[in-house]
Amino acid sequence: MPRTQRNDNFIDKSFTVMADIILKILPTNQKAKEAFVYYRDGMSAQADGEYAEALDNYEEALRLEENPNDRSYILYNMALIHASNGDHEKALGLYQEAIELNPKMPSALNNIAVIYHFQGEKAKEAGQEDDAENLFDKAAEYWKQAIRLAPNNYIEAQNWLKITGRSEMDVFF
């Protein structure tokens, strides 16, 4: 049974009904509508912690979806799952693909920076200072890009950039 038919709380049911109405009235082709159904089911499964099911749905949505912007969000959600499961390399690749399709996605840029920062901390703990600094520099570059796109967000990153001397004043204004 499709996930959309299993929603058992009011909010999920309401969202499903509204999404179905929108799908019926929007002038999109059948393939795009099917892609959206898989994407919606993927988001629902992801919210429930059913990551394997979510990835299956996202894969199918990605196969069907042709719109680059929509594909970027599918890739982004897939990356979130891989990152939360500790597969940072896979997540980085998916975030990069998402950014290639949608360069103005600050959340993907931020998440890449978070992964590089995490890896930098691990390298530092292992006594690999040069590797740590390189990873921190990568994190800084991605955070700067994210902050340029969303200057009111990522306050902790802005503070980290200032504290570590990795910021330029024009980034924040």
Curated annotation (Swiss-Prot):
PANTHER family (alphabetical): CELLULOSE SYNTHASE OPERON PROTEIN C, TPR REPEAT-CONTAINING PROTEIN MJ0263
Pfam families per record: TPR_12 (PF13424)
Source organism of this protein record: Synechocystis sp. (strain ATCC 27184 / PCC 6803 / Kazusa)
Record gene name: ycf3
A single GO cellular-component term on record: plasma membrane-derived thylakoid membrane
Record's keyword terms, sorted: Membrane, Photosynthesis, Repeat, Thylakoid, TPR repeat
Family of this protein: Belongs to the Ycf3 family.
Protein name: Photosystem I assembly protein Ycf3
Top-level taxon of the source organism: Bacteria
Places the protein is found: Cellular thylakoid membrane
GO term, biological process aspect, one: photosynthesis
Function: Essential for the assembly of the photosystem I (PSI) complex. May act as a chaperone-like factor to guide the assembly of the PSI subunits.
Main location: membrane
Bilayer topology annotation: Peripheral membrane protein
TPR repeats: from-to residues: 35-68, 72-105, 120-153
